[in-house]
Amino acid sequence: MNRSRRGFLFGAAASGASLAIVKSSAGAFGIAEQTASLRGRFLTHVSVVRVNQIEVTPTKNIGQDEAADNRPERIRSRRDAFARGCPDGKMTWAISWLALHDSRKEYQEARRLLAEYHHRYGDEVTFIPGGYFAPMYDTREHNRRTNHEALQMISTMVGGGYRPQCLVAGFMDAENQRHLAEDEGIHVCQGQIWSQHAIDNGDGDGGICYPYYPSREHYLKPAQGRADFIDCVCLDGWTCDFLAARRDGFKGGFNSRMGVGPIETVGNLGATAGRREMMDTTAMHFDTGQALNGFGFVTSIWETSIGHDEDLAWWLQAVRERWPDTKVITEGAFGLEWRKHNPDNSKLNYRFDEKGTGAPGSEKDLEIEWFMNREFRLALLHNWTKGDPPMVIDFTRYDLRAEEPRSPEREWSLMNVINQKGTRQQDKPVRISQLTPDDQRRIFAKYPELKRRA
């Protein structure tokens, strides 16, 4: 089975429908218990410059050589597309280990361009270790040393005392996020790929899709208090359609990573349906999500090698026309803005409510609701056209002890009571009333309005 995002092409035509702002059936169009006072709509775009498709360690590569697709003209094309879509925006560039070290004139020019973009536009330039999958392929200590050396090289490359405000990692273990904060002075890490499982080279479902401070126990667990607190804001890397994201890999012939990324949308569905899904997914956060949470956050990492520059320009233009107050800023700037309003996780209370868009894997007759806080995450699914009762498809408790793998391996998820992917015998959807009395009390203490829907 081809697990890669790029290798999956969905042949069927899509007939997606725009997502309307919906009133939460939990009675929650009032803003949830606020994550401090952060307000607004925020979009971050990351472009990756690399040599090999997946540089899992400094000395090991998986996948194809992409040097031809990362040449300077491709980098210029990407920046021009971003500027057409958002002339006053700032973006983040993530450069790989091999791209930092490659002596070919094309990569010398690429590095010069990235430094120029920082000085001219205020773009952020940072490091991407392990081709998104550093913990899956290398030890914590090796990754720490690699991060340290690469960040020093980037400071030298950009000059002027420059220091990145974040690390773009795909996945990054808790210990190395602690090192970023304490040793490198970096307090933002794109450190998880929310809901990713059975796709590409690493699995990591179980976390929160909006910012949080990770626990020393596990990078997907929000810190519970001072004892396990890591002062590094952990960010998701790709905003996905929540209904598509509940699936495991390509189960049922659908792509669980479908959202605002071009591979899973335009690449699989065609320009019309694909762009519609990109906007529908954006609306989940900038319409309903912003109303529920006080702010909306949409993010995606687009490798320079994949192209789709016209789709990037179109999407950014469409976002600015529909939500003109959107702030298009760097990854580090967004994380630090959230950090400014949140000294810890005590006010975490994110809520999301999506009715399907009609794109493949996002069924129009289904509604999914997510509740995410420091103590647990809860997902409810039901057929809203029939008035079916909500079923719990995910209940992950964060008050329980968690432990990361001790050595490199593929599986870095955090699963306990019920997980949305349905990969274990216990992952069967149930009514809230079928959970243990203790778990019901835990849920109702946070969301008493769910009692009538149990």
Each model region followed by its residue ranges:
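Catalytic grooves of carbohydrate-active enzymes
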Residues: R50, I54, Q64-E73, S77-G85, ...
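Active-site-adjacent pocket scaffolds in enzyme catalytic domains
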Residues: A32, P164-Q290, P343-P360
